[in-house]
């Protein structure tokens, strides 16, 4: 977002006659007013609410971790960006649309500071996104290094470093704008009495060529864009490979727990705890990938327009492609507002723990309206791409194959105490047979020996055996193949 290139043209026409002290609004003012001042403001208000809620939830004791600390800082920078965007761009079109001169004078008074704060917020938002991407990259691809480098202290120092860099890098922005008095309209009561112009420093050719052109475009456009694209491509590929292996490793852990002869519930509880930690890490990574790809999508057109400005020249675009260039710049501002407002929606849709904490913070209902928030993980389809339920396959002999199907509650709750006495029900098209078998038959890695089942499977058809507890609840299912 560039204020200098968006300065109001203060040379209006009245009844077709130029008025050197009057106001001439922007071209397509009605469209810009509706897009930025109306729709953009509504989206920004929602974004401020969402970012405040995000910061409130992610700082709760149960949600505190290095990744959420980065996301909290991102919410703060995005909120500052939304506030400055309103007071710079939305307010400018409101002033022109309503012809409020007093508001225009106030706008000129604070514009220089809002302009610098806008760039500081934008730089902080970009590099917090880069920092959390690198943190997730280390957690996914180099977990051992991540434990040593990405603790809470490291995250806090990184955020402090990003904030310091954002302030230092943009400190000259405080001096790029100046308001001068127009000698042709010196009374101070006309629109042209005060003129907003680039300062002498901003007009310096060396400053423009080195800082404004090459350094700013590299630091704010090319480097973060390419870095995010590269790291998130690696993360996305690693996640895809991890999800394909997720079922196998999870099933292997359950088999190991079932094979233990002592402390079976404790073993499965330990496996469940480890799986839960891995699940939370995987969810955090997937949420970040979505945030970054939306960030890249919202900033892609700004990346393209910057390339066009460097190749064709800004003056050429303004003169020969005036409509295209004008609306492209407004689209960039509008997409920046969307990008700073949408993270809350991503957390709400894809963050299971975030939804739980949201219900705790705001309660189950607001003025009688029940909040029906989804409770299932939105990425379940990724993990169950090739299956419909958790299954464990193992071979016991060369002639007979067994498949044990376990419900998810077996791993999550580790409630196996009631399995010491179970009933094996053999289901078959020819009839049903029942036989009692203890749980230790599963602990040694073998399936229960039931003579009647061998007769039933001799005709070449599989036989399904269900393990049920005293309450009649099916705990697991053994499918025997001939």
UniProtKB/Swiss-Prot annotation:
Membrane topology value: Multi-pass membrane protein
GO cellular component, one term: Golgi apparatus
Sequence intervals crossing the membrane: 33-53, 69-89, 114-134, 149-169, 219-239, 285-305, 331-351
GO biological process, one term: neuropeptide signaling pathway
Cell inner membrane keyword on record: no
Keywords: Cell membrane, Cell projection, G-protein coupled receptor, Glycoprotein, Golgi apparatus, Membrane, Receptor, Transducer, Transmembrane, Transmembrane helix
Glycosylation positions in this chain: 6, 170
InterPro entries hit by this protein: GPCR-Ligand_Int (IPR052954), GPCR_Rhodpsn (IPR000276), GPCR_Rhodpsn_7TM (IPR017452)
Extracellular side: 1-32, 90-113, 170-218, 306-330
Signal peptide positions on this chain: none
Pfam families, per the entry: 7tm_1
Family the entry assigns: Belongs to the G-protein coupled receptor 1 family.
Subunit relationships: Homodimer. Heterodimer; with daf-38.
Name of this protein: G-protein coupled receptor daf-37
Lineage, top ranks: Eukaryota, Metazoa, Ecdysozoa, Nematoda, Chromadorea
Gene this chain is encoded by: daf-37
């Amino acid at each position: 977002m560039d204020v200098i290139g968006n300065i109001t043209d203060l040379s209006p026409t009245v009844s077709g006659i130029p008025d050197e002290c009057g106001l001439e609004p922007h071209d397509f003012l009605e469209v810009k007013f509706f897009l930025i001042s109306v729709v953009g403001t509504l989206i920004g208000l929602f974004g401020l609410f969402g970012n405040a809620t995000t910061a409130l939830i992610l700082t709760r004791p149960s949600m505190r971790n290095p990744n959420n600390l980065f996301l909290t800082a991102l919410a703060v920078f995005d909120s500052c960006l939304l506030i400055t965007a309103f007071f710079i761009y939305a307010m400018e079109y409101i002033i022109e649309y309503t012809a409020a001169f007093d508001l225009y004078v106030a706008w000129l008074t604070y514009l220089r500071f809002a302009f610098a704060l806008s760039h500081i917020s934008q730089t902080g938002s970009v590099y917090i996104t880069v920092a959390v991407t690198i943190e997730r990259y280390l957690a996914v691809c180099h977990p051992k290094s991540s434990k040593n480098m990405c603790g809470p202290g490291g995250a806090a120092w990184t955020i402090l470093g990003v904030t310091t860099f954002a302030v230092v890098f943009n400190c000259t922005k405080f001096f790029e704008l100046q308001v001068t008095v127009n000698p042709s309209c010196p009374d101070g009561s006309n629109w042209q009495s005060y003129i907003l112009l680039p300062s002498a420093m901003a007009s310096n050719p060396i400053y423009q060529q080195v800082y404004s052109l090459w350094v700013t475009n590299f630091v704010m456009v090319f480097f973060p864009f390419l870095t995010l694209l590269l790291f998130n491509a690696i993360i996305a590929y690693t996640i895809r490979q991890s999800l394909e292996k997720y079922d196998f490793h999870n099933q292997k852990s359950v088999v190991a727990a079932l094979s233990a002869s002592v402390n079976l519930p404790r073993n499965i509880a330990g496996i469940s705890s480890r799986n839960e930690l891995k699940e939370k890490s995987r969810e955090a990574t997937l949420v970040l990938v979505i945030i970054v790809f939306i960030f890249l999508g919202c900033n892609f057109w700004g990346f393209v327009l910057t390339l066009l400005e460097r190749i064709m020249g800004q003056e050429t675009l303004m003169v020969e492609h005036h409509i295209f260039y004008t609306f492209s710049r407004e689209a960039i501002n509008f997409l920046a507002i969307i990008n700073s407002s949408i993270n809350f929606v991503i957390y709400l849709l894809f963050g299971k723990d975030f939804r739980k904490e949201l219900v705790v913070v705001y309660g189950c209902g607001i003025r009688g309206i029940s909040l029906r928030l989804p409770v299932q993980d939105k990425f379940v389809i990724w993990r169950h791409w090739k299956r419909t339920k958790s299954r464990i396959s193992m071979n016991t002999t060369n002639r007979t194959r067994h498949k044990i199907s376990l419900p998810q509650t077996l791993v999550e709750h580790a409630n196996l105490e009631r399995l010491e006495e179970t009933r094996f029900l053999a289901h078959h098209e020819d009839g049903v047979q029942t036989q009692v078998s203890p749980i230790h038959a599963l602990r040694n890695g073998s399936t229960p020996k039931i003579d009647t089942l061998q007769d039933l499977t001799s005709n070449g058809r599989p036989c399904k055996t269900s393990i049920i507890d005293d309450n009649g609840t099916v705990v697991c299912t053994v499918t025997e193949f001939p």
